[in-house]
Amino acid sequence: MEKPYIVGVGGANLDICGRAGGQILERDSNIGSIHLSSGGVCRNICENAVRMGADVKLISAVGADANGEILLQRCKAVGLDTDCVFKLQGYRTGAYLSVHGPDGDMVNAINDMDIMQALTPELLARCDRVLRDAAVIAVDANLPPETLRWLCVSYGADKPIFADTVSCAKAPRLLPVLPYLHTIKPNLMEAQLLSGGESPEDCAAALLEKGARNVCISAGSRGVYYRNREEGFWVHPYPLEDVANATGAGDSLMGGLLAGFAAGMPVRERVRFAVTASVLTIQSADTIRRDLSRQLILDSEKECILP
């Protein structure tokens, strides 16, 4: 019998990061370093969950190009199932290009995610059996609104669906499907936008009124506020003196929520597990911590999370 698995549906792309070696000169070629890595919110969430011991299948799309091959190879190398990642003619593999100054601060960026529009209900219907047999489904707000609705209507009654808001620009796509979602994970700015509230507590209460069932709000160094219809609670991390890279905190948090759910963890244990994963991640220079594992998270919880 196949082990219960997670299905992630959403963005997968290559991240191309350039960092100047000195002060950036506009309209000129600047000497520096260029780093290529795998990215995309849903793909990153899925890789985190794999590193935490979960079986995960990714549903996404890449172009029939060299970047698509690189991305698929890198996904497979970490154990992520890509059988339902479609290679599409006429599309470019999604890419995110950022330029940073010598201090690491971003100067500018361009994202090319047009391929996400190709993830239509008709295309995803080819993965019906994979979706129906999943223990839990994760989606991100990179998906077109009609695809989000189709997924939620088709599978939300029988399968728990976890949703990542991605950004303030894309988070509103989730409002019409809130009642179908098991869990929504916004950061505080996204929660304020969706709810009209100010504090995490007020935002979560308002989202419950709008139909949400479980709300997990990441509030930066304060930690995470979790609320459902039975209870609400905070999980606070110990203060950190050094943050190496906060970029991957949200993706590891969501990966932890999913891996914990798939493993049958009770809600409070699941949230503490996820927050510990997030704390460990921001102590690494990499967006996805390379040595992240279920055992490392379990061993580190008491050092990372306040009682």
Predicted stretch roles:
Residues A77-G90:
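A glycine-rich helix N-cap at a beta->alpha junction
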Residues M1-V7, N30, P200-P307:
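Conserved phosphate-binding/catalytic region of the ribokinase-like
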Residues A95-V99, N108, G223-R227:
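Short beta-strand scaffold segments in enzyme catalytic cores
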Residues K87-L88, S98-V136, A141:
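Conserved phosphate-binding/catalytic loop of the ribokinase/pfkB sugar-kinase fold
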Residues V50, G156, A262:
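Gly/Ala-rich phosphate-binding loop of Rossmann-like dinucleotide-binding domains
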Residues G156-W234:
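Conserved phosphate/ATP/ADP-binding segment of small-molecule kinases
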Residues M1-L80, H236, V243:
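Glycine-rich phosphate/adenosyl-contacting loop at the front of the ribokinase-like
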